[in-house]
Amino acid sequence: WVIKNKDGGMQKNHTPAVMDMLQYSLSPLHTGFSFIDAGCGNGWVVRYMNNQSMCETAIGVDGAIEMINKAKRLDTEGQYILSDLMDYKPMKKVDLVLSMEVFYYFSNPSKLLNHIKKHWLQSKGRLIIGVDYYKENQGCHNWSENVGTPMEMLSRKDWVDIFITSGLSNIKHWLSCPNNDFIGTLVITGTVS
């Protein structure tokens, strides 16, 4: 996306849903917290989180070297890690993991969710994800073919079931930022017991 100079457009298009996800996740927090952006792209969410007074640590992880390099160019003080999400294990577990438009790139999203639950999230930690690529969103059905990248097409129910099966608690889901042309970003969240 960076090579094609499309990361800025992704940031602009995803900002409303990400802000909705963050508002939901941060509103109950009253103490300092730690954060990971899983699939951080150019690092815009990490930069935003580093400006939040209660955020003690914000880390961005991405498997694309161009994205990590751009994130580091834009934010020389931020923590950005080049790694496949399935291989990454933070030195210290965190309170909040956010992922926007990433999980469907994995052939087994439940495996990624379980890896994050086991290795990234501390007790009472929250995972919140947003996906625009799901069965009920008819406008996305040609994305995999158009982009030339495999994507895992799941229904809203399938996504929620992955969270339930993982053993996460307090699972919630909703469609964020719908409009006349778009059914909305599917947001799913849950916490570690």
Name each model feature, range by range.
Residues 131-150:
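Short, glycine-/aromatic-enriched active-site segment of Class I SAM-dependent methyltransferases
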Residues 124-132:
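Conserved beta-strand signature within the Rossmann-like core of class I S-adenosyl-L-methionine
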Residues 168-178:
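Conserved S-adenosyl-L-methionine
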Residues 151-166:
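Short alpha-helix
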Residues 98:
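A conserved beta-strand element that flanks and buttresses the S-adenosyl-L-methionine
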Residues 36-38, 42-87:
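Class I SAM-dependent methyltransferase SAM/SAH-binding core
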Residues 110-123:
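A short glycine-rich, Lys/Arg-flanked "PGG" loop and its adjoining helix->strand segment in the class I
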Residues 1-28, 135:
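Conserved class I S-adenosyl-L-methionine
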